[in-house]
Design a protein with these regions (language model features):
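Metal-dependent active-site segment of extracytoplasmic phospho-/sulfohydrolases and closely related
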Residues: 154, 159-160, 212-227
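Formylglycine-dependent
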Residues: 8-52, 60-154, 159-169, 193-207
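Extended hydrophobic/aromatic segments used for targeting, binding, or gating
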Residues: 173-216
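N-terminal cofactor/phosphate-binding cores enriched in small/glycine residues
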Residues: 1-3
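Short alpha-helical functional segments enriched in proximate histidine and acidic residues
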Residues: 50, 54, 144, 216-223
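Conserved amphipathic alpha-helical interaction elements at protein-protein interfaces in regulatory
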Residues: 6, 147, 223-226
Length: 227
């Protein structure tokens, strides 16, 4: 950081927004961080003004929900991911955020994770959650790339969240490939306040998260070659 650009910081805008429930899980009605000043021009706005169709997939963290600085107001045509940087630490959330200008959306909305909300965010019940955000975000990014025909230039920002604070992912072949790969595993006891759940295979989880991200990147590059 050179000192010549805006730093978002992590000032939160949650405490006075009230509550909303998803299943038995309580969330703030408004989530997110301090918004960018609208006079501070950001890259997607420049690209949009120059004729590009724009997409962003992953973490936003450039302004809380409903603020002056959300993807729909800052040059993004298609967005899917986390508006809030804190929530982006977690991989089986109660909701994600979405905006699709082409579909007629007028603002960023919440998309409820129906396969998650009937289970607690912390504890053994958490293992029953099925909607894994990293996979969903990548899937939406690939759908967006598929729609690019070459008639209009496109600009994508892929702010994927792997790996991050929470060590959690599907128990699939990617995770299983690292079983027993480390001479000494590490146990993480969890943090109820942050909803980071316990794991006995911290090294295995982290390594698999990096591999999962690498697979995503490979798929993106292959799709770009097609285009």
């Amino acid at each position: 950081h050179t000192g010549h650009t805006k730093v978002r910081g992590n000032k939160e805008y949650w405490p006075n927004s009230g509550w909303v429930y998803y299943g038995n899980n309580r969330e703030y009605k408004v989530a997110g961080q301090e918004p960018y000043d609208p006079n501070h021009i950001i890259l997607p706005e420049i690209m949009k003004d120059n004729g590009y169709t724009t997409g962003m997939f992953g973490k936003w963290a450039g302004g809380y929900e409903g603020s002056v600085s959300t993807p729909d107001k800052r040059g993004i045509d298609r967005y899917y991911g986390y508006i809030c940087q804190f929530q982006a630490h977690l991989y089986y959330p109660n909701f994600l955020n979405s905006y699709d200008r082409a579909a007629g959306d007028t603002e960023v909305k919440r998309v409820v994770m129906e396969n998650n909300i009937n289970y607690a965010m912390f504890g053994d019940d958490y293992k029953n959650r099925k909607d894994y955000s990293a996979d969903l975000i990548h899937q939406e990014a690939m759908k967006w790339l598929d729609k690019q025909t070459g008639e209009q230039p496109f600009f994508g920002i892929f702010t994927y969240t792997l790996p991050h604070a929470e060590l959690a992912q599907p128990n699939d072949s990617i995770l299983q490939a690292y079983q027993g790969a480390f001479c000494q595993e590490k146990t993480y006891g969890g943090d109820a306040g942050s909803y980071y759940n316990h794991t006995n295979i911290a090294h295995q989880q982290f390594a698999a998260m990096v591999t999962r991200l690498d697979a995503y990147v490979g798929e993106v590059l292959e799709k770009l070659k097609e285009k």
